[in-house]
């Protein structure tokens, strides 16, 4: 109680001081003084709280004394102030200074903690300690121990452990007195526990009996009320169910009667309708016989007229197919001629020529009239518009193969003109000069040296019949491209080996693509003209 009141008063003083100083500082607006006062106030609150908490928690007191600057001195001064000459010896002694006070009183300075500070007789002869004070913890064997009593036993054991940890050395008489007091305390605790358990058992028994009686009375009352309620509810539900069942059966009976009535009426109507239909059929049969006789007599030439119309329709279909085939062939010849003209003309763009639209047009025309597919292989030797099963195989003709290969070669790709191929070949002039100066197995240094010295070479022009060096080959290819002899130029370039062939690989692909497209267009043009 004294510690708690002291801490409360100290906290109130600190808070009141902080509030007063804060109001004054805000009014005067002195930032330096305000900072100093706040720092001092914070340090005061910190140390005051640490000292106050050290009185209640031994672990925190040890940490505060060891690691906080001036913590040990403040705690010591507080204990001297609180437990000094003005207090009675033995009252309110903290566990922290218990060992020191016992040693001072018994062995060293008996006047240091004297309550009155008066003169006392000093014992000249000090009895040396004979053995260490040892105590056992209080043990109460009861599983149903009250929580509050268990907390009390734990607090007593904690105090005993603290006294044991002080390692106090006393005489036999002092130890005997302490052990006697300890035995009395243990007996009192055991007796209190026994009385507490007996009282608790008695109270539990009385309350249990009272609760059981109350529950029995309440159960009987609830059972009677519930029985009456369920009986009334059952009678009411039974009456409601009986009324609903009677109403349901009455409705079902009325529904069945109406259904039977409708069935009989429908059956009667069906019989009347059947009789009418039979009469109509007989009348129709008579009329048909009359019409057949009249047609055989007056319309005998109708079948011959129908056969003539059918023959005329077949002739018209054949003529239509022939005209459509002729138109498709004409458009395909015109389209292939325009493709040839585009390939021979100079390119209008640097990227090349795209033939996707023309190829799609050729595929569409070939699908209108079956020109590109052959007749089937079946034994019946069907025509080109075979309608046999899927198992009927078809052998591809040159027309179908040509269209497919043209689609693969030119679809999604650009075709270069002769002028564009010639310009791209001229762009390889520097690489050819460097390649002509390369050794057998050139490295990075060899390529660099050849590139530097190639700037000093002159470009050879014209055709050299016997020339086999790279400059002669370059000049021959240039001349063939200029004269539109792309096949010979491509053959000379393909015959190159090593690094020159690698340099010309892109040009070779473009030239091959152009020659393939031209050859396929020529093949398709020949096939279309032969139809």
Curated annotation (Swiss-Prot):
GO annotation (BP), single: protein import into mitochondrial intermembrane space
Q: Which residues lie on this side of the membrane: Mitochondrial matrix?
A: 16-34
Note the coiled coil stretches, chain numbering. Answer: 210-267
Q: How is the subunit organization of this protein annotated in UniProt?
A: Component of the mitochondrial contact site and cristae organizing system (MICOS) complex.
- List where in the cell it is found: Mitochondrion inner membrane
Q: Where is the transit peptide?
A: 1-15
Family designation? Belongs to the MICOS complex subunit Mic60 family.
A Pfam family found in this protein is Mitofilin
Q: Which gene encodes it?
A: MIC60
Gene Ontology cellular component list:
MICOS complex; mitochondrial crista; mitochondrial crista junction
Q: Where is it mostly found?
A: mitochondrion
Native organism:
Vanderwaltozyma polyspora (strain ATCC 22028 / DSM 70294 / BCRC 21397 / CBS 2163 / NBRC 10782 / NRRL Y-8283 / UCD 57-17) (Kluyveromyces polysporus)
Report TM segments.
35-53
Print the keywords alphabetically.
Coiled coil, Membrane, Mitochondrion, Mitochondrion inner membrane, Transit peptide, Transmembrane, Transmembrane helix
Q: Which PANTHER family does its entry note?
A: MICOS COMPLEX SUBUNIT MIC60, MITOFILIN
Which first-to-last residue range defines the signal peptide? none
The name this protein carries in UniProt is: MICOS complex subunit MIC60
Mitochondrial intermembrane topology: which positions? Answer: 54-531
Write out the function statement from the record. Component of the MICOS complex, a large protein complex of the mitochondrial inner membrane that plays crucial roles in the maintenance of crista junctions, inner membrane architecture, and formation of contact sites to the outer membrane. Plays a role in keeping cristae membranes connected to the inner boundary membrane. Also promotes protein import via the mitochondrial intermembrane space assembly (MIA) pathway.
Q: Membrane topology for this entry?
A: Single-pass membrane protein
Instruction: Show the InterPro entries listed in the entry.
Output: MIC60
């Amino acid at each position: 109680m004294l510690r708690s009141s002291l801490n409360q008063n100290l906290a109130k003083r600190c808070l009141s001081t902080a509030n007063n100083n804060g109001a004054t500082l805000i009014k005067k607006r002195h930032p330096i003084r305000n900072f100093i006062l706040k720092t001092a106030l914070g340090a005061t609150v910190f140390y005051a709280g640490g000292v106050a908490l050290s009185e209640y928690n031994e672990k925190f007191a040890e940490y505060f004394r060891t690691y906080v600057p001036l913590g040990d001195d403040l705690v010591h001064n507080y204990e001297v102030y609180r437990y000094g000459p003005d207090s009675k010896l033995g009252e309110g002694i903290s566990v922290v200074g218990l060992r020191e006070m016992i040693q001072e009183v018994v062995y060293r300075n008996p006047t240091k903690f004297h309550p009155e500070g008066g003169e006392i007789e000093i014992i000249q002869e000090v009895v040396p300690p004979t053995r260490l004070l040892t105590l056992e913890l209080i043990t109460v064997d009861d599983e149903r121990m009250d929580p509050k009593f268990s907390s009390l036993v734990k607090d007593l054991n904690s105090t005993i452990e603290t006294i044991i940890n002080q390692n106090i050395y006393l005489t036999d008489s002092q130890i005997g007195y302490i052990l006697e007091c300890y035995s009395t305390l243990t007996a009192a605790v055991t007796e209190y526990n026994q009385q507490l358990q007996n009282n608790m058992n008695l109270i539990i028994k009385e309350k249990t009996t009272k609760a059981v009686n109350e529950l029995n009375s309440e159960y009987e009352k609830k059972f009677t009320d519930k029985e009456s309620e369920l009986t009334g509810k059952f009678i009411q539900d039974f009456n409601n169910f009986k009324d609903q069942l009677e109403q349901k059966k009455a409705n079902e009976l009325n529904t069945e009667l109406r259904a039977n009535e409708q069935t009989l009426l429908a059956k009667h109507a069906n019989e009347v309708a059947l009789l009418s239909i039979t009469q109509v059929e007989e009348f129709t049969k008579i009329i048909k016989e009359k019409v057949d006789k009249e047609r055989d007599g007056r319309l005998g030439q109708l079948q011959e007229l129908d056969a003539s119309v059918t023959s005329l329709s077949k002739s018209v279909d054949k003529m239509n197919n022939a005209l459509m085939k002729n138109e498709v062939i004409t458009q395909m010849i015109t389209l292939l001629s325009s493709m040839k003209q585009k390939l021979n003309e100079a390119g209008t763009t640097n990227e090349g020529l795209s033939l996707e639209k023309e190829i799609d047009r050729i595929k569409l025309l070939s699908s209108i009239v079956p020109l590109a597919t052959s007749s089937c292989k079946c034994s019946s030797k069907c025509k080109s518009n075979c309608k046999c099963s899927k198992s009927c195989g078809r052998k591809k003709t040159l027309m179908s193969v040509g269209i497919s290969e043209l689609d693969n070669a030119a679809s999604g790709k650009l075709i270069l003109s002769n002028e564009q191929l010639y310009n791209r070949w001229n762009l390889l002039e520097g690489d050819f000069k460097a390649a002509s100066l390369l050794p057998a197995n050139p490295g990075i240094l060899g390529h660099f040296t050849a590139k530097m010295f190639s700037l000093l070479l002159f470009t050879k022009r014209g055709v050299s019949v016997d020339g086999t060096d790279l400059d002669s080959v370059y000049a021959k290819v240039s001349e063939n491209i200029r004269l539109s002899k792309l096949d010979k130029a491509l053959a000379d370039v393909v015959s190159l080996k090593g690094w020159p062939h690698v340099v010309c690989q892109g040009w070779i692909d473009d030239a091959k693509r152009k020659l393939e497209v031209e050859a396929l267009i020529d093949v398709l043009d020949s096939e279309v003209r032969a139809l």
